[in-house]
Design a protein with these regions (language model features):
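Mature N-terminal segment immediately following signal peptide/propeptide cleavage
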Residues: 1-3
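Extracellular parallel beta-helix/beta-solenoid repeat domains
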Residues: 5-22, 26-514
Length: 514
């Protein structure tokens, strides 16, 4: 990696417009990266290593650091980064007009473990089995390795996921465990995959940048998310593949992509997403609470998401941004404010803000969101299959989701919903969902298999969602109750969809239709 670091520095020095990386395999590693993976596998970071590795003060290694580059195209076709350890393989920070092409990111020791069922004895209870799993030779574990954070059983030949849970787990040796499992259709030969950590650093981190494009990039694995973008403007992903390495049925431990506090246009075009541990994309801003008042117009505010921001960097508004004041219980928007002054306080995980007119006398139960930092999202011609959570999750004020194919996703394929309890906002507006094909999604959970639009809060009665168009989609989910579910939308049009479910195909609750 030293040669690549020198090449980046030379590009900065010379002002070159193209950086060509010689095709081949490159080991990307560091002492902290190897130590982190060893600590996770030994159980030194506890049952949920995210609590240590996903914090603002956690120190980690960075591999290919492009920070500060501008007006550069990096050609990495035929280049494979083989990551040894838990780290951030690629960083794009404070960059402008940068395109990364052709790179593949994978891991020497995968950040998950794979095994196969060698014994499967039925119990008296329906679909409950005594199971023995033999892990692959290159997937040794210890007695304290986290094994039950997120896992999946699947047919080893077809790759079809099976809905099952581990009732009890017993470590046998570094390549075997036994378990009592409840799973429909589990049998000898089925494959078992499990991650050993949730969020950590992303494979590709885009931050504080403008006009960034990833083209023909592949991410096979990562102990965290695939691509994370934060506080950046105009990001395009063209033919991004977040898919397992050949022969595997797991890619990234959590989200394939995740974008927060973005501006401009965010476009995902002809991308492929398979077998990751969460949504294929989640686009949102953050709700923040007023923690201390200085005056009617000056206050300290703090982001309150359970896990912190998704890059573990402070979220804050810029001078001139618009803040929306929202009631947490029903997500009703009460007022808007212009930001006149901001002081960042990263060590205290808050910022001091002055706005253009007074806040209410009491801000108990109220939240502020920066609605200037919401991109227009385009998700066009992508395909997704066999992964956890939702396909698309949108909390923005403008989006087009068109001509995508989604199959066998655990939850609903497309969701537009603010989440008060997770402090991710805002309530969606101006969303068009058109011409998508959705097959057998939402089989594990969700109000509908295909498309869900709602406010996720305690009292969703405020009709804070508006201007929603759902048209010409094909949804086939014969085991699901509903195909489309919309709640609390002021201005919704549902037309021209073909929906095949066992129950009512389209459900609209408390909506005003066009």
């Amino acid at each position: 990696m030293q040669s690549l670091k020198k090449a980046v520095e030379q590009v900065k020095k010379d002002g070159a417009k193209t950086l060509f990386i010689e095709p081949g395999d490159y080991i990307v590693t560091g002492e902290r990266a190897r130590a982190a993976q060893s600590a996770v596998m030994a159980g030194d970071f506890g049952e949920n290593p995210q609590k240590i590795m996903f914090t603002p003060t956690y120190e980690y290694d960075i591999g290919f650091d492009l920070s500060g580059l501008s007006d550069v195209k990096i050609s990495a076709y035929g280049v494979r980064f083989i990551v040894d350890g838990f780290m951030e393989p690629v960083r794009i920070k404070n960059c402008e007009n940068v395109e990364l092409l052709g790179l593949t990111v994978t891991h020497k020791r995968k950040p998950f473990s794979r095994g196969h069922v060698t014994k499967c004895t039925p119990r008296n209870e329906e679909n409950v089995f005594d199971v023995t799993v033999e892990l692959d030779e290159d997937c040794p574990i210890t007695q304290k390795t986290p094994m039950l954070l997120r896992y999946m059983w699947c047919d080893a030949l077809s790759g079809k996921n099976k809905n099952g849970g581990i009732i009890s787990y017993t470590y046998v040796d570094e390549h075997h465990f036994t378990a009592v499992v409840k799973c429909i259709g589990l049998c000898v030969g089925d494959e078992f995959n499990t991650v050993h950590a949730f969020h950590s650093r992303p494979a590709i981190h885009i931050a504080e940048s403008k006009n960034i494009t990833l083209t023909d990039v592949t991410i096979n694995s990562q102990p965290g998310m695939g691509v994370v973008g934060n506080r950046s403007e105009n990001v395009t992903l063209k033919r991004l593949w977040v898919v397992p390495e050949c022969g595997y049925h797991w890619s990234t431990n959590t989200d394939a992509t995740h974008f927060t506090s973005m501006t401009g246009k965010l476009r995902l075009e002809n991308c492929v997403f398979e077998y990751h541990g969460d949504d294929f994309t989640n686009v949102h801003g953050y709700y923040q609470e007023v923690v201390t008042r200085v005056s009617d117009t000056e206050f300290f505010m703090q982001e309150k998401t359970p896990d912190g921001t998704h890059t573990q960097a402070l979220d804050y508004p810029d001078v001139g941004d618009t803040l929306e004041l929202t009631r947490k219980s029903d997500l009703r928007v009460l007022d808007t404010y212009k930001v006149e002054k901001v002081t960042l306080m990263p060590d205290e995980w808050m910022c001091r803000v002055t706005v253009d007119h007074p806040l209410p006398e009491s801000t108990e139960g109220l939240m502020l969101a920066d609605v200037t930092r919401l991109p227009f999202v385009e998700i066009i011609g992508c395909s997704a299959s066999s992964h956890f959570a939702r396909g698309v999750l949108l909390k923005t004020h403008g989006a087009l989701v068109e001509r995508n194919t989604m199959r066998d996703i655990h939850g609903p394929a497309i969701v537009a919903a603010s989440e008060a309890w997770w402090y991710e906002g805002v309530s969606p507006r101006n969303i068009t969902i058109r011409g998508n094909r959705i097959v057998n999604c939402g089989m594990f959970w969700g109000e509908a298999a295909g498309i869900v639009v709602k406010s996720d809060c305690d009292n969703p009665v405020s009709r804070n969602i508006s201007d929603i168009i759902i048209e010409d989609n094909v949804i086939e989910a014969p085991l699901a109750e509903h195909g489309i579910y919309v709640r609390g939308a002021d201005g919704v049009e549902v037309r021209g969809n073909i929906v095949k479910t066992r129950g009512e195909g389209v459900v609209l609750e408390d909506c005003v239709q066009y």
